[in-house]
Structures are given as structure tokens and as C-alpha cells.
């Protein structure tokens, strides 16, 4: 495992990339409505990243087989890596949009789950609990804490709410690379795993299912779905370990009204 501790100059670049990624999710929010296709949402995000932000969408042509879009858009029982298509969103859907922007060689990665129209009680509760689970993990971050502390905070909260945590996919280190060490799993035991140090940068991005945790990957090689077709939600932020806690690079506009980058409520 090779972990690159970031300098202050590096972190300044990551703040820019993270803010751009968050801005994409703010920009697209008004368009997430019944009747819009996920392909149209992807096109809007792509155009904004390339033409307005003068940045690069990291997902496009990433991996093997090459991912065919600039964003991952995952609807209802799709856990992650949903491929945008001409299929339209329906009233009551939940939809996750995952964006990674490259600016001046540095990555900013964030995602959020949106409510489409009038969403039922279970869907709204799942989205809210997943958001809070992400924050439970984030709030454990400080020098001397461990990856197990993060995972335990997420897992214990989600399971107490009678939801399940996806184990096969996780957060990750990030910087000049899209996916760097370490892997940040969303389950674990307190005090176990890698000890956090100032200058580490990574994502926390729990995927929480309303049903069981079991999943399968579809034939396209990318789309991950719940095996029992239960709803799944996800939220993600990119952050750095600081002297005494953390700094989040990907807060959206509404979050910036409520929280400082260090997570303190305003």
C-alpha cells in the first residue's frame, strides 16, 4: 500500500477540484425531475464540466470496459456505476449522481442521492439515513483514528436503522489519481485498520440498501444492483485529514450554509 500525504499546495488544488465537482451536483439538481432521461442529465453535466468549468470528467472512458459516460447515474435498486440511458425518471424514484472532476491534474469526487417528485416514506428514510451514515463516518476522522473507526460508525448506525451496508465497494484515496490507497470500507471494528495521518485524502461514500446487502453486477460490466431489488442510496464527500480533524472539499451550496469545511455547524 502506497499512501501519498498531500502538501498544502496539493490541498489547495484539491479544494478547487472538489468545489467544481460539488458545483456540478448543484447545477444539475433542478433538472432531476420526472420525465427526464438519465442520458440528458449526463449530457448536461458533461457540457458543464467541459465547457463551463474547463475541466475533465474523470469517469468518461475510465476502466475496462471503458465507462461510456461522464457521470454514474444509479436509479432505485442500482447501487452504483449506473450507465446513463434514454430511460426516463419516474415520480417516486430515488437517483444517485456521481461526479468526478479533474482540474489541473487533481481529482474531486462527490455524489448525492436526489428525490424525484413525491418519494415514498421508505425511499426518503433510506436517503436520509444514508446521508447521516456518511456524516457519522466523516466525524470520526482525525489523526490517530483508524479506518475501522470510520467503518464502524457507518455500519453501526445503518444497521441500527435496520438497513444493510454494501461491502464489495468502498471509498478510496484520491488526489492526482482517481483511485489511490487506502481503500475506505464502510464497515469495521473500532481501532482496527490503518491509522489516519495529517495529509491523507480520501472519499467516504457509503452505499446503504433498504433490503439485504447482496448484490450482482450486470452484463455491461459496470451496473451494480441489489440482488433482492431493494432500494439503495449513496452519498459521498472527498476530504483531507487535518491537524485536529478533517476538511471536506466537496460541500454543496446548501451544505456550505450549514457547515464549515471542518464540519462544524454554523
Features from the language model and the residues they span:
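Active-site neighborhoods and metal-handling regions in enzymes and metal-associated proteins
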Residues: 1-266
Amino acid at each position: 500500500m502506497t499512501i501519498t500525504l498531500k502538501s498544502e499546495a496539493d490541498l489547495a488544488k484539491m479544494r478547487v477540484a472538489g468545489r467544481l465537482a460539488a458545483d456540478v451536483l448543484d447545477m444539475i439538481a433542478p433538472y432531476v425531475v420526472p420525465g427526464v432521461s438519465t442520458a440528458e442529465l449526463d449530457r448536461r453535466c458533461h457540457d458543464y464540466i467541459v465547457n463551463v468549468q474547463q475541466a475533465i470528467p474523470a469517469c468518461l472512458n475510465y476502466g475496462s470496459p471503458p465507462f461510456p459516460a461522464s457521470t454514474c447515474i444509479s436509479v432505485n435498486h442500482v447501487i452504483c456505476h449506473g450507465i446513463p440511458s434514454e430511460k426516463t425518471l419516474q415520480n417516486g424514484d430515488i437517483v444517485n449522481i456521481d461526479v468526478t472532476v479533474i482540474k489541473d491534474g487533481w481529482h474531486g469526487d462527490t455524489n448525492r442521492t436526489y428525490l424525484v417528485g413525491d418519494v415514498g416514506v421508505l425511499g426518503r428514510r433510506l436517503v436520509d439515513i444514508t446521508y447521516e451514515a456518511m456524516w457519522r463516518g466523516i466525524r470520526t476522522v482525525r489523526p490517530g483514528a483508524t479506518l475501522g473507526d470510520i467503518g464502524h460508525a457507518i455500519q453501526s448506525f445503518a444497521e441500527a436503522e435496520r438497513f444493510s451496508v454494501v461491502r464489495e465497494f468502498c471509498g478510496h484515496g484520491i488526489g492526482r489519481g482517481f483511485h489511490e490507497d487506502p481503500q475506505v470500507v464502510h464497515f469495521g471494528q473500532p481501532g482496527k485498520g490503518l491509522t489516519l495521518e495529517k495529509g491523507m485524502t480520501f472519499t467516504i461514500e457509503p452505499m446503504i440498501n433498504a433490503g439485504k446487502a447482496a448484490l450482482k453486477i450486470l452484463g455491461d460490466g459496470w451496473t451494480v444492483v441489489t440482488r433482492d431489488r431493494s432500494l439503495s442510496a449513496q452519498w459521498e464527500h472527498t476530504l483531507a485529514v487535518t491537524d485536529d480533524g478533517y476538511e471536506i472539499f466537496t460541500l454543496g451550496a446548501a451544505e456550505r450554509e450549514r457547515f464549515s469545511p471542518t464540519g462544524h455547524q454554523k
